[in-house]
C-alpha cells in the first residue's frame, strides 16, 4: 500500500485533464509515484554517499533525475 496520500494524486490526474478519477486509479497512481520517488531517492542517497556526505543536497536530486 502506498504511503503517499491518494487525494493529491487524484488532483494531479485532474490537473492533467481527467474529469473523474476512480478510487482504484488514484491508489494505483499513488503506488506508481511512490516507486518512482523511491528510485530517485535511492540514487540521490547514493550520490551523497559517493561524495562522502550524510546530507542529500539539491544537486544530488537533480543529478539523480538526470540519469
From Swiss-Prot:
Keyword field: Chromosome, Cytoplasm, DNA-binding
Keyword Transmembrane helix: no
Coiled-coil annotated residue ranges, if any: none
GO cellular component, one term: chromosome
Site (Interaction with DNA): 14
Region: Interaction with DNA, residue numbers: 20-22, 54-57
UniProt GO molecular function: DNA binding; protein heterodimerization activity
Cell compartment(s), UniProt: Cytoplasm; Chromosome
Main location, first listed in the record: cytoplasm
Keyword Flavoprotein among record annotations: no
Alphabetized Pfam families for the sequence: CBFD_NFYB_HMF
Subunit details: Homodimer or heterodimer with another histone. Dimers then assemble into higher oligomers, with the DNA wrapped around the protein core.
Function: Binds and compact DNA (95 to 150 base pairs) to form nucleosome-like structures that contain positive DNA supercoils. Increases the resistance of DNA to thermal denaturation (in vitro).
Similarity field: Belongs to the archaeal histone HMF family.
Name of this protein: Probable archaeal histone 3
Amino acid at each position: 500500500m502506498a504511503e503517499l496520500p491518494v487525494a493529491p494524486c487524484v488532483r494531479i490526474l485532474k490537473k492533467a485533464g481527467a474529469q473523474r478519477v476512480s478510487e482504484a486509479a488514484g491508489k494505483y497512481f499513488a503506488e506508481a509515484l511512490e516507486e518512482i520517488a523511491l528510485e530517485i531517492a535511492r540514487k540521490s542517497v547514493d550520490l551523497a554517499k559517493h561524495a562522502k556526505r550524510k546530507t542529500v543536497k539539491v544537486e544530488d536530486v537533480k543529478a539523480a533525475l538526470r540519469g
